[in-house]
UniProtKB/Swiss-Prot annotation:
Coiled-coil ranges from the UniProt annotation: none
Role played: DNA repair enzyme involved in the repair of deaminated bases. Selectively cleaves double-stranded DNA at the second phosphodiester bond 3' to a deoxyinosine leaving behind the intact lesion on the nicked DNA.
NCBIfam families: PRK11617.1
Keyword Secreted: no
Organism: Enterobacter sp. (strain 638)
Compartment(s) of residence: Cytoplasm
Single GO molecular function: magnesium ion binding
Family affiliation: Belongs to the endonuclease V family.
Keyword Cytoplasm: yes
EC assignment: 3.1.21.7
One cellular component (GO) term of this entry: cytoplasm
Protein name: Endonuclease V
Residues that, per the record, bind Mg(2+): D35, D103
């Protein structure tokens, strides 16, 4: 595994990330969520992608792709491991979204190329990274109140918003992926909340990927 080459690719790709709002439809009509996991001891990569109507946030389509994992887990290079399965799920969608939420980092990455940015560049779609853990940067401690907010900073640059979406829950790290500004990324995440820790696009993607009860109930009521 030539990490120097991958690192150079990350730096080059990161220079092409668009950090401002460039949505083709604003407001969007369809919003997608994506979640990636691994099965069979990491041998299989599973990507779930869901489509939701906006602003109702009604789930209208889902796809799950499973492919052989193409590279081992290497911290800082996760997007190279995840994007092939994401692309496989993306290509199965009957319609393409106007905005995509990805469970993972956007520019809040040491080389400014988390999976949300990498995939957004790959398919040229506006993306937002919604991560559950910090990868780099620092932020001031948040109060315990829901809605508490702080910038995630690294070397004088804001990489994300750290936002406590729900009481008694760890905060989310909301970042530009591609073609969405940092402030707009947070605003879109906030618009897509329905009382859970995660915004609806990534919550549904996780529910589909893991066959959670919410998804099973949804399947049962479909005509």
């Amino acid at each position: 595994m030539d990490l120097a080459s991958l690192r150079a690719q990350q730096i080059e790709l990161a220079s092409s990330v668009i950090l401002e709002d460039r949505l083709d439809k604003d407001p969007p009509q369809l919003i997608a969520g994506a979640d990636v996991g691994f099965e069979q001891g990491g041998e299989v990569t599973r990507a779930a992608m869901v489509l939701l109507k906006y602003p109702s946030l009604e789930l209208v389509e889902y796809k799950v792709a499973r492919i052989a994992t193409t590279m081992p887990y290497i911290p800082g290079f996760l997007s190279f491991r995840e994007y092939p399965a994401l692309l496989a799920a993306w290509e199965q969608l009957s319609q393409k979204p106007d905005l995509l939420f990805v469970d993972g980092h956007g520019i809040s990455h040491p080389r400014r190329l988390g999976v949300a940015s990498h995939f957004g560049l790959l398919v040229d779609v506006p993306t937002i990274g919604v991560a559950k853990k910090r990868l780099c940067g620092k932020f001031e401690p948040l109060s315990a109140e829901p809605g508490a907010l702080a910038p995630l900073m690294d070397k004088g640059e804001q990489l994300a918003w750290v936002w406590r979406s729900k009481a008694r829950c760890n905060p989310l790290f909301v970042a530009t992926g591609h073609r969405v500004s940092t402030d707009s990324a947070l605003a879109w995440v906030q618009r897509c909340m329905k009382g859970y820790r995660l915004p609806e696009p990534t919550r549904w993607a996780d529910a589909v990927a893991s066959a959670r009860p919410a998804f099973i109930r949804w399947q049962e009521i479909q005509p």
